[in-house]
């Protein structure tokens, strides 16, 4: 326990909470340009080729973002919208690309959970 004198000298500092998506700078989403689109393999025990993109954000950060859904049209120089949200089995991937906005088209023939993949209601 600190003495009264110690508390007068320097006050108690509040515990600062560290953000899990620092590149967004407190914003819900950020726009960016793809610099590289490639696939990586997940951690054990999973096995797949997960599609990711290296994105240069308007905030100046260069991040790795996951491309959700089946099939995508993202390539180098594509302008994409990035949101927070990590991918548990891909170390270092802490962002998702928002499908159905800017240059990232929605997932083709998606019937359920459409809002998460940028798909309009079928007629």
Swiss-Prot record:
Broad class of where this protein is predominantly found: plastid
Entry's Gene Ontology BP terms = translation
Mind telling me which CDD domains this protein's record contains? Answer: Ribosomal_S12
Could you tell me the keywords of this UniProt record?
Chloroplast, Plastid, Ribonucleoprotein, Ribosomal protein, RNA-binding, rRNA-binding
User: What molecular functions are annotated in GO for this chain?
Assistant: rRNA binding; structural constituent of ribosome
Indicate whether Ribosomal protein appears among the record's keywords.
yes
According to its record, what are the GO cellular component terms? chloroplast; small ribosomal subunit
Task: Kindly list the places in or outside the cell where this protein is found, as annotated in its UniProt entry.
Answer: Plastid, Chloroplast
Q: Which SUPFAM superfamilies match?
A: Nucleic acid-binding proteins (SSF50249)
Per the UniProt record, one Pfam family is: Ribosom_S12_S23
Name the PROSITE patterns on file: RIBOSOMAL_S12
Which Gene3D superfamilies does the record cross-reference, listed alphabetically?
Answer: Nucleic acid-binding proteins
Subunit structure as annotated in this protein's UniProt entry: Part of the 30S ribosomal subunit.
Q: What NCBIfam families does this protein's entry cite?
A: rpsL_bact
Q: What does this protein do?
A: With S4 and S5 plays an important role in translational accuracy. Located at the interface of the 30S and 50S subunits.
Please report which protein family the annotation says this sequence is part of: Belongs to the universal ribosomal protein uS12 family.
Q: What is this protein called?
A: Small ribosomal subunit protein uS12cz/uS12cy
The source organism is: Populus alba
From the broadest rank down, the organism's phylogenetic lineage runs: Eukaryota, Viridiplantae, Streptophyta, Embryophyta, Tracheophyta
């Amino acid at each position: 326990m600190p003495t009264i004198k110690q508390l007068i000298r320097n006050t108690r500092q509040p515990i600062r909470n560290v953000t899990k998506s620092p590149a967004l700078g407190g914003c819900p989403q950020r726009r960016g340009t793809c610099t590289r689109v490639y696939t990586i393999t997940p951690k054990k025990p999973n096995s797949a080729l997960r599609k990711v993109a290296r994105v240069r954000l308007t905030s100046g950060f260069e991040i790795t973002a996951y491309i959700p859904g089946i099939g995508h049209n993202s390539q180098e120089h594509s302008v994409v919208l990035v949101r927070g949200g990590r991918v548990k089995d891909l170390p270092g991937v802490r962002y998702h690309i928002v499908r159905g906005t800017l240059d990232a088209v929605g997932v083709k023939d998606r019937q359920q959970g459409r809002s998460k993949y940028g798909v309009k209601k079928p007629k």
